[in-house]
């Protein structure tokens, strides 16, 4: 039996852990540069706020309906997610982390009442992290996702499904007749993997509910759509077509990019931003145990600013040897900026992509800056470089991100750090769990 554990309105719930005043009130989390609503509380959904809706379209609800908006705090959300996933892992022998707020658990070999076990797990997550969750249980991944949908909607919309299925729904424990009733009450577009385009085509073919899909001919679906939809159908019938991936394959490319909070015109500003993005990408590279053989750097003006002169810079730099060293990757990215930068332009976005990724275990060509390497051979291999990067990562985890960093990541003006390119986050809450200086203070 598989379970899909999902935090309810993850980003909003994280904010509510440290700001109880937000509970029961309409809340939205805004995207980078505070442009669009990327998360909504149930109360905000009830006001009609749509996912990805531009903030300016609903800003009037602040005054008329008491809507509260906060800027995205991804550092906080990521840390809270890690804590939640660690708790879930205690309850099952295998876990696949699917996204920042979802994971699959495999209960094969686990004895006892799984609903009771999941109830204990939900209580532990709430007690230790403060996040509300829903759990869906089923014999396949797709059925577990469907069960999670039922568990959520039963709680959020009373009457949508039987109340007893709220919070924790085990479709493996309901009879066939009741399962078909649940299928009949669910639009086909709510099924995992069935997107808008496929939903439209299915509706045109007379398939509007999940029950309609389950009763369809598998071979016909494969012919008219794809083998993927056929597998979805089989999974809904209880035939497992997707195995649990408890050791997901590493990404083949790692991209970090941002739109700037305001236009950047100086080469130093672009170098600073690109250095930051390269450092973030290097962290992700080491986390998955890889090295990069090439670095792609780009920065561009905004095509939406018609009165501005337009310029787009893009280059890929092959590296002498694959590396996961932040210094080497930042150096390559910064060098590319100096070669491509042109004065007189209002740059609006930049990014760094690490390419040609390889297993670090198969590539140990690393340079130790503090080792016995001749200055004339900067690319000479040394195992010390990997140890230095591991120490850097450890210090940053312990004392907060960027406690140890490459100098070009942050510009300095009159002794003070400045980031002209930083995204607009006028409403960001403190990073309570990862920054000592932002930790909540209790006064006795």
Language model segments and positions:
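C-terminal hydrophobic structural anchor segments
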Residues: 334-398, 405
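Gly/Gly-Pro- and Ser/Thr-rich, intrinsically disordered tail segments characteristic of DNA damage-repair
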Residues: 1-234, 243-244, 376-444
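Short, charged/polar surface micro-motifs in flexible loops or helix N-caps
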Residues: 9-10, 34-36, 302-305, 357-361
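Short, charged/polar, Gly/Pro-enriched secondary-structure boundary elements
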Residues: 111-114, 154, 306, 359-364
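DNA-contacting surface of Y-family translesion DNA polymerases
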Residues: 190, 198-347, 361, 440-444
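Broad gene-expression machinery/nucleic-acid interaction feature
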Residues: 2, 102, 132-134, 294-296, ...
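Short, hydrophobic beta-strand segments
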Residues: 103-108, 313-320, 365-373
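Short loop/turn motifs enriched for small/polar and acidic residues
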Residues: 138-140, 300, 353-357, 409
């Amino acid at each position: 039996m598989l379970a899909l554990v999902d935090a309810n309105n993850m980003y909003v719930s994280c904010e509510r852990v440290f700001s109880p005043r937000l509970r029961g009130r309409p809340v939205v989390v805004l995207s980078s540069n505070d442009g669009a609503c990327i998360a909504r509380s149930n109360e905000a959904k009830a006001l009609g706020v749509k996912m990805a809706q531009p903030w300016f379209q609903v800003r009037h609800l602040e005054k008329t309906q008491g809507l509260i908006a906060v800027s995205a705090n991804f550092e906080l959300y990521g840390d809270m997610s890690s804590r939640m996933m660690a708790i879930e892992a205690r309850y099952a022998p295998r876990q696949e982390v699917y996204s920042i707020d979802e994971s699959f658990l495999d209960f094969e070999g686990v004895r006892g009442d799984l609903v009771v076990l999941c109830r204990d797990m939900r209580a532990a997550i709430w007690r230790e992290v403060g996040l509300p969750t829903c759990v869906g249980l089923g014999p396949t991944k797709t059925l577990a996702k469907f069960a999670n949908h039922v568990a959520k909607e039963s709680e959020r919309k009373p009457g949508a499904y039987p109340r007893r299925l709220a919070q924790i729904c085990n479709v493996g424990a309901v009879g066939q007749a009741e399962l078909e009733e649940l299928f009949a009450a669910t639009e086909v577009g709510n099924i995992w993997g069935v997107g808008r385009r496929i939903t439209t085509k299915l509706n045109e073919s007379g398939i509007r509910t999940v029950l309609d899909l389950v009763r369809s001919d598998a071979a016909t679906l494969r012919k008219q759509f794809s083998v993927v939809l056929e597998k979805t159908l089989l999974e809904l019938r209880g035939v497992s077509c997707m195995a649990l991936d408890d050791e997901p394959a590493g990404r083949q490319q790692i991209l970090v990019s941002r739109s700037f909070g305001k236009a950047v015109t100086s080469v130093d500003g672009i170098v600073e931003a690109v250095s930051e993005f390269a450092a973030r990408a290097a962290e992700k590279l080491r986390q998955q145990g890889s090295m990069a053989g090439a670095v792609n750097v780009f920065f561009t003006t905004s095509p939406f600013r018609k009165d501005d002169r337009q310029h787009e810079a893009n280059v890929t730099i092959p590296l002498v040897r694959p590396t996961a060293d932040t210094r080497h990757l930042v150096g390559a990215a910064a060098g590319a900026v100096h070669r491509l930068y042109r004065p007189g332009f209002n740059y609006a976005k930049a990014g760094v992509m690490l390419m040609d990724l390889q297993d670090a275990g198969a590539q140990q060509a690393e340079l130790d800056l503090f080792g016995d390497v001749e200055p004339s051979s900067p690319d000479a291999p040394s195992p010390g470089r990997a140890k230095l990067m591991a120490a850097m990562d450890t210090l940053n985890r312990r004392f907060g991100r960027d406690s140890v960093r490459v100098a070009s990541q942050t510009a300095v003006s009159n002794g003070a750090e400045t980031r002209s390119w930083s995204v607009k986050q006028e409403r960001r809450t403190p990073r309570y769990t990862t920054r000592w200086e932002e930790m909540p203070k209790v006064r006795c």
